[in-house]
C-alpha cells in the first residue's frame, strides 16, 4: 500500500518548542532527509536516533523526549501528527521524507520494518557535488508514479499499441499525423480519458508533480492535453530525433512536457537537450523529467531491453 503523502511534499507546520523558539518545518529543515516519528516511547525513539542521527534529521511528535539527535515537536492536541500521518494510528510509526520533504517510506517503529529505512536512506544518497557550467533547465523528480500504477500502464500498453506518428503540416498547410521512421520510431498508446487508469495518472501528476512546478517555476493552472504510454525497444532501433513539442499551430498552447519512466531494466535510452549540453538525462523508475515544450530534445536509442515511458503535455486551458 502506498503511504499517505508518498511522492508528495509534506505540509508545513509551525510550533513553539520547549525553549520558546519558533520551529517551522519547511524553513528550518534545510538539508538532508527527515525521519518523523509518531507515538514512540523514549527508549524506542532513542534506538532509532542512535541508528540514524548521523544520516537524517529526526523529529518526534508528542511528549518531550531526552534523546540526542532528536527534535521533540510539541503536539498536545495531536493535530500535527494527524495531518502528517493521516488519521488514527494503533502503533508507533516512522515516516521517511527526502531532502525535498517528499515522503519515501512509512513503517512501524518497532520490528523489522525499521531495517527498510536503512535501504531507503541509502537510496537517497547523492553523488558527490560537482561544479556545473552547462545544464539544461530540466526538473528531475523521483516517485511520481507508484509501482502498481506503473505496472498497470505497461499492461495496458501491451494490450493495445500502434506505431507512433509525427505531427506535421502538409503541402497545403493542413495538420496531419504521419509515420516517419527516419525521424521517429516507437510504439504508442493514448490513454482513454473515460477509463479509471487515465484518472489515476491525472491524480498522481496533480498531487506529486504540479506542486513542484509551482514551487520551482510558478507554473499553475495547466491541463493535461493527453497521456501516452510509449516504448523504445532496442531490437527495433527505436528513437525520436531532436524536436520541439510546441512548434505547430495545433501544439502552440503546450507549456510543459513530462516524461516518466515506467521501468529501469534496460540499457541506454534517455533524453538529450542538445542546445545546452550532450548529457543524457534518465530518471529512476517511477520518476520523471519536466521541461519546457520549447526546448529542443531527442530520445536516444535503447541499446538493450525495452524502455517504457509515460508522456504528457501540460497545456494552457481551453
Question: For each predicted feature, which ranges?
Answer:
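Chalcogenol-based redox active-site neighborhoods
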Residues: 1-125
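Structural recognition of the beta-strand scaffold that forms the well-ordered cores
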Residues: 60, 289-290
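Fe(II)/2-oxoglutarate oxygenase catalytic core
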Residues: 88, 99, 110-288, 294-318
Amino acid at each position: 500500500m502506498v503511504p499517505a503523502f508518498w511522492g508528495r511534499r509534506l505540509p508545513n507546520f509551525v510550533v513553539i518548542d520547549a525553549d520558546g523558539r519558533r520551529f517551522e518545518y519547511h524553513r528550518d529543515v534545510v538539508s538532508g532527509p527527515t525521519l518523523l516519528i509518531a507515538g514512540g516511547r523514549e527508549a524506542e525513539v532513542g534506538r532509532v536516533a542512535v541508528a540514524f542521527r548521523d544520516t537524517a534529521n529526526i523529529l518526534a511528535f508528542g511528549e518531550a523526549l531526552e534523546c540526542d539527535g532528536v527534535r521533540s515537536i510539541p503536539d498536545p492536541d495531536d493535530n500535527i501528527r494527524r495531518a502528517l500521518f493521516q488519521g488514527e494510528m494503533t502503533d508507533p510509526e516512522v515516516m521517511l521524507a527526502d531532502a525535498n520533504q517528499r515522503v519515501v517510506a512509512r513503517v512501524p517503529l518497532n520490528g523489522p520494518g525499521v531495517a527498510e529505512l536503512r535501504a531507503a536512506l541509502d537510496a537517497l544518497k547523492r553523488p558527490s557535488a560537482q561544479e556545473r557550467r552547462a545544464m539544461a533547465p530540466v526538473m528531475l523528480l523521483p516517485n511520481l508514479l507508484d509501482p502498481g500504477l506503473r505496472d498497470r500502464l505497461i499492461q495496458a500498453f501491451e494490450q493495445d499499441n500502434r506505431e507512433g506518428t509525427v505531427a506535421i503540416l502538409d503541402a497545403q498547410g493542413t495538420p496531419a499525423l504521419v509515420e516517419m521512421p527516419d525521424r521517429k520510431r516507437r510504439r504508442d498508446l493514448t490513454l482513454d480519458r473515460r477509463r479509471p487508469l487515465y484518472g489515476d495518472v491525472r491524480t498522481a501528476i496533480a498531487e506529486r508533480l504540479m506542486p513542484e512546478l509551482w514551487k520551482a517555476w510558478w507554473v499553475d493552472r495547466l491541463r493535461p492535453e493527453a497521456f501516452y504510454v510509449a516504448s523504445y525497444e532496442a531490437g527495433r532501433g527505436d528513437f525520436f530525433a531532436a524536436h520541439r513539442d510546441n512548434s505547430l499551430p495545433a501544439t502552440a498552447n503546450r507549456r510543459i512536457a513530462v516524461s516518466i519512466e515506467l521501468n529501469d531494466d534496460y540499457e541506454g535510452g534517455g533524453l538529450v537537450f542538445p542546445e545546452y549540453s550532450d548529457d543524457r538525462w534518465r530518471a529512476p523508475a517511477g520518476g520523471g523529467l519536466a521541461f519546457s515544450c520549447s526546448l529542443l530534445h531527442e530520445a536516444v536509442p535503447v541499446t538493450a531491453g525495452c524502455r517504457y515511458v509515460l508522456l504528457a503535455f501540460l497545456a494552457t486551458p481551453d
